[in-house]
């Protein structure tokens, strides 16, 4: 039975131009991995990003964020890639609060 809301259990973060997007594409080729189609949703640093750097694709609403993972299944590792989580002061704490068992892959 599928859960009502699927949540990511791993995150890919890293420096600018460190290939976080490429890694997410490679991982998504495996049937046991689900990566959100939206690259860099910025959800966990939505309050840390100055207005000047906000993107149209930035997600602030929790339901919209969880909707990114609604096609994932219980037997998949579920992830997302937002490189700037590495630099956002509150991202790691927010990720831990929402997803205490999740893993963070840091690409440098």
Enumerate the predicted regions with their spans.
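PAPS-dependent sulfotransferase catalytic core
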Residues: 1-86, 94-107
């Amino acid at each position: 039975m599928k859960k009502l809301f699927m949540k990511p259990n791993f995150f890919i973060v890293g420096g600018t131009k460190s290939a976080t997007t490429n890694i997410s594409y490679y991982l998504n080729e495996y049937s046991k991995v689900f990566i959100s189609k939206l690259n860099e949703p910025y959800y966990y640093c939505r309050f840390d990003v100055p207005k000047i750097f906000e993107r149209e694709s930035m997600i602030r609403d929790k339901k919209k964020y969880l909707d990114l993972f609604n096609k994932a299944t219980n037997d998949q590792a579920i992830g997302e890639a937002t490189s700037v989580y590495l630099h956002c002061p509150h991202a790691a704490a927010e990720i831990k609060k929402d997803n205490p068992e999740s893993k963070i892959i840091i690409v440098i």
